[in-house]
Structure formats: C-alpha cells, structure tokens
C-alpha cells in the first residue's frame, strides 16, 4: 500500500465556486480526504498575462492549452476590472469543505504573492499572511493550522515570516520528504511538507500526452523514494479535467495507492533542512526547493 498526500490548491473565484463542489463530491464518492488550500482575497489571476512575454511561460500556456484548461474568465480576472473577492462570496462552499477535509491558507491575493512576495520586506509579508488567515478563520469559524505558499514562492524570508503564526505545518516548497527548516536563530522551524510530484500543467505536452498522464503519474508515485505528495488544482481537476481525476482515483485504488491529508504524513522526528530558491522543469520562474542540512 502506497500512501500519497493529496493537496488541492484553489487559486480563483471560479475554482472555488465551481471546482471545489465538484471535487468535494468526487472525494466523497471515493471516501478520500485531502488538504484544501484556499485563496480568499481578490481574484487578480488575469494579471499574470503580462508574463506571456517570457518564452517559458508562453510555451507552458500553449502546450497546456490554457484557454481550454482554465477558461477565459480566469485568464482575464482582475485585468480590465477589479478582481472579485473570493472568500466571503463563497463562504458556504469553504465551510462545507472544512467539515470533511483539512483546510488551510493558500493566499490572500494569489497573484500578488506569486508576482511580488519575493521582493516584499518581512513585515509586509506577515501582514499579508495575517489578512488571509484572519479571513479564512472568520469563514470557517475555527483556527487555521496549515498553509501552502501560492506558486511555491517561498524562501528563508517566507519561513521566518510564517513562524509568527504557530501553524502545525506548511507546504511551501518542492522536495522529497517532510522536514523542519532551520531558522535564522539556528532552531528548527515549523514542519514543511513538500510537494514531490509534478502537476498536470508542468508536464502535459512536454513529458506526456494528456491521455497517458494517469498511468505516467502512478508510475512516478510507485517509484517515489520519499514521501509522495501530489497537488491538483480546483481550476483544472475540478473543472475541465474532472473526469481524468476520477479515472486517476479509480486506477490508484486498483494499484494499492491511497490518498490522505498532508497532516497524516507527519510522524516521528523530522530531518533538518532549508527552503532555497530553485527551478524545476515545466514551471516558469523561481520557487522554493527543499535542501537538506549539510547539502549544497
């Protein structure tokens, strides 16, 4: 039996309004619990369109057929008009998710975090995280115990900023296994649970065809030597590709692969490490990567 942490990122208004209810229904039918990370502030995701001038981002949008994958409402959100606030407008959906799944903060403003957090000072970052946590806690009526940085934009500055909130864990980076990042003080920080597996949009049209993805992914899961964690998006697997996701769950069950919330992957003493800026194939720009203590 192979246990895989299932992380669901919710980036947009439509992903929350349409994708999350569909995913909740699918997960309920398959008796699966997951960790769902919500963006709760304005939906300004369309402002990423300026990145089309970057060849790597343009190629990703073309090979993943982004207009079909996400829809034009997502691709244009917050461009010609102010972005709609996601959280309170979809409070009932978020509360329903929290009844059955682990719920955490993805971002206040997903676009702002992904585009600008790398240049923020620590207090700006703390204020942004606090605003998101406060909003999500108002919605679900209970403390938020986990978070996952938007776009995996995380480094030492993010690690230090999140310590102020005493969360149980964060999932801010890509890597191989859960660990504790070393703080500037030299003490271990809040546990990190890295994502170990590629997302749909990182590999489709580059490493694998859409129709072959599920078999390809299950093979990667079976070969994963660390602690497998897989991320889906409400805007993708909850919308245009929900049938592919259902097929993945069926095939996974046949192969002895089970999915669980990320917190179930925390056990025993965790190794020490750091979150450093790095790059991975299929994703434009830098992102947080796990670096084990003593390695460079």
Curated annotation (Swiss-Prot):
Ranges where the NodB homology domain occurs: 2-260
One Pfam family hit: Polysacc_deac_1
One cellular component term from this protein's GO annotations in UniProt: membrane
Pathway membership, UniProt: Glycolipid biosynthesis; 4-amino-4-deoxy-alpha-L-arabinose undecaprenyl phosphate biosynthesis; 4-amino-4-deoxy-alpha-L-arabinose undecaprenyl phosphate from UDP-4-deoxy-4-formamido-beta-L-arabinose and undecaprenyl phosphate: step 2/2; Bacterial outer membrane biogenesis; lipopolysaccharide biosynthesis
Source species, domain of life: Bacteria
PROSITE patterns assigned: NODB (PS51677)
InterPro entries named among the record's database cross-references: ArnD, Glyco_hydro/deAcase_b/a-brl, NODB_dom, Polysacc_deacetylase_ArnD
Example of a GO MF term: hydrolase activity, acting on carbon-nitrogen (but not peptide) bonds, in linear amides
Enzyme nomenclature, EC number: 3.5.1.n3
GO biological process per UniProt: 4-amino-4-deoxy-alpha-L-arabinopyranosyl undecaprenyl phosphate biosynthetic process; lipid A biosynthetic process; lipopolysaccharide biosynthetic process; response to antibiotic
Keywords: Antibiotic resistance, Hydrolase, Lipid A biosynthesis, Lipid biosynthesis, Lipid metabolism, Lipopolysaccharide biosynthesis
Catalytic activity: 4-deoxy-4-formamido-alpha-L-arabinopyranosyl di-trans,octa-cis-undecaprenyl phosphate + H2O = 4-amino-4-deoxy-alpha-L-arabinopyranosyl di-trans,octa-cis-undecaprenyl phosphate + formate
Record NCBIfam families: PRK15394.1 (NF011923)
Family: Belongs to the polysaccharide deacetylase family. ArnD deformylase subfamily.
Function of the protein: Catalyzes the deformylation of 4-deoxy-4-formamido-L-arabinose-phosphoundecaprenol to 4-amino-4-deoxy-L-arabinose-phosphoundecaprenol. The modified arabinose is attached to lipid A and is required for resistance to polymyxin and cationic antimicrobial peptides.
HAMAP family on file: ArnD
This protein's name: Probable 4-deoxy-4-formamido-L-arabinose-phosphoundecaprenol deformylase ArnD
Lineage, opening ranks: Bacteria, Pseudomonadati, Pseudomonadota, Gammaproteobacteria, Enterobacterales
GN (gene name): arnD
């Amino acid at each position: 039996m192979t246990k895989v942490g299932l992380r669901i990122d919710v980036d947009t208004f439509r992903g929350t309004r349409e994708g999350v209810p569909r995913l909740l229904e699918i997960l309920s039918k398959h008796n699966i619990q997951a960790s769902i990370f919500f963006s709760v502030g304005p939906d300004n995701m369309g402002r990423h369109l300026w990145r089309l001038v970057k060849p790597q981002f343009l190629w990703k949008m073309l090979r993943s057929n982004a207009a079909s994958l996400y829809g034009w409402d997502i691709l244009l959100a917050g461009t010609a008009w102010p972005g709609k606030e996601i959280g309170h407008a979809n409070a009932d959906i978020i509360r329903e998710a929290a009844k059955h799944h682990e719920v955490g903060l993805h971002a206040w403003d997903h676009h702002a975090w992904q585009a600008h957090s790398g240049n923020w000072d620590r207090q700006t970052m703390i204020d942004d995280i606090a605003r998101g946590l406060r909003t999500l806690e108002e919605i679900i009526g209970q403390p938020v115990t986990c978070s996952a940085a938007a776009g995996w934009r995380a480094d030492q500055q993010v690690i230090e900023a999140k310590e102020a909130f005493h969360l149980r864990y964060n999932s801010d980076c890509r890597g191989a296994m859960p660990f504790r990042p070393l703080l500037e003080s030299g003490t271990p920080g809040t546990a990190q649970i890295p994502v170990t597996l590629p997302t749909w949009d990182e590999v489709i049209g580059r490493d694998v065809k859409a129709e072959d993805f599920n078999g390809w992914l299950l093979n990667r899961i079976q070969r994963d030597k660390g602690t497998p964690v897989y991320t889906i998006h409400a805007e993708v697997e909850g919308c245009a590709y929900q049938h592919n996701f259902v097929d993945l769950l069926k095939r996974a069950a046949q192969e002895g692969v089970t999915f669980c919330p990320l917190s179930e992957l925390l056990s025993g003493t965790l190794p020490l490490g750091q979150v450093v800026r790095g790059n991975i194939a299929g994703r434009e720009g830098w992102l947080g990567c796990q670096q084990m203590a003593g390695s460079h």
